[in-house]
């Protein structure tokens, strides 16, 4: 009988590149190899539906051992290709790990940079707060010195007024002539106009004090607003911390779910190993399919949960950044408002200083006028004394020469009566002027007391404002620290979310690969089950002898006899790869 040549397809199958076709070709080779080893009694037991190629293979005589070894060694490239594929996957996983480490390093560098920036910002804010404190202290000292100077000037003015009052009282006794009455009336009118001007200036000072009170109340309101904003920032920081805690809990839940998936995979591997001796249990395959579907559903749920957490995190991060920007803008606005108010207060102080200088000049003018009046009074007194001497001399002469000088005496008496009447009028005018001076003095004293009270209140308010500014600065520092901690936790959560996403993708790919392997094993089992059942009992003793000759015989026989073992080995490899990626 002629020995038929082996089919070229059995040797060309391992050279194909697609990994999905390897199990089918391996099974075909096994079936073709098992035919020549089988006994010649196969002619009786073979059915009529068998292909002519299989019959021709069975009729062929026994092939030598060297040819069988060559055929067996042809399967080594398949295993080498699978090993190379696994090595490539390992390389890809290592590259992904290196990329994730680089991303972690970049995130750490960015976190350090942000920390340095926050420290610089805190230092600049502390320096600004110290400068503001120094400026406020210097201004308080300047205001106190100005107040003391004003009080001294008021004391000098009161002393000058008292001296002028004494001089006016002296003038009551000294004024005796009618020529200076008109001049005194003019001077009184001028003094009245000056008094009216002083009253207007006092009203202006009152209005300035009211404006200062309004400014202080406005600053207090703005400080309250700033405190409210700081409280809002604190509440936002607490919310951010709560959100971070919720995210951490969600991450822990996802980790527990991943662990449960790992346990499921391990259970599947154990079940595959336990069911390695069974051949073609359809119920176990269906259970495996159901478990794989459940794993897919869990992976999809995990993926959706990770996406939801990422969206929440991005939304919270955007909200926190917006709140931080608004807080910084509010702080800048408050600082600009303080600067504007300081400028306004400086302008008001300059105006008050100018008004004080003008009042001082007017008082000096009044003192000069009073000195002039004193000199004129002295001159008038000297004239009165001279006239009295003349009057005495005339009386003496009248006593000596009464009949001659009666006309002159009458004239002198009439002149004296006129002078007395003029003196009475001047005394009345002086009394009215004195009453006006006393009323003005009382008004000045009341205004001074009100000014002192307003100054004390302003100083107390300034002290409270400085304390509130210190407290607000401390609160701002605490808020910035909380925001920095929240940003650090956010970066850590981002890294964990990315790692979980990578793990979920790896789980999904592993589940898809396992599903494809199981589906391929099922199809091959269903198609070749009958043939294996029919030809499984026709093994020759030659095959049993050659089982231990090659190291790959055990693996190929196991693959042909139980495809579940092959799937279990693939699942084990996938589990090892996932563990390496997690490390």
From Swiss-Prot:
UniProt keyword list: Chloroplast, Coiled coil, Phosphoprotein, Plastid, Transit peptide
Locations listed in the record: Plastid, Chloroplast
Compositionally biased region (Polar residues): 34-52
Low complexity compositional bias, start-end: 519-529
Presequence boundaries: 1-55
GO cellular component entries: chloroplast
Described purpose of this protein according to its UniProt entry: Acts as a scaffold, mediating interaction of ROPs with different proteins.
Family per similarity comment: Belongs to the ICR family.
Subunit structure, interactors included: Interacts with ARAC8, ARAC11 and KIN13A in vitro, but not with ICR1 or SEC3A.
Protein name: Interactor of constitutive active ROPs 2, chloroplastic
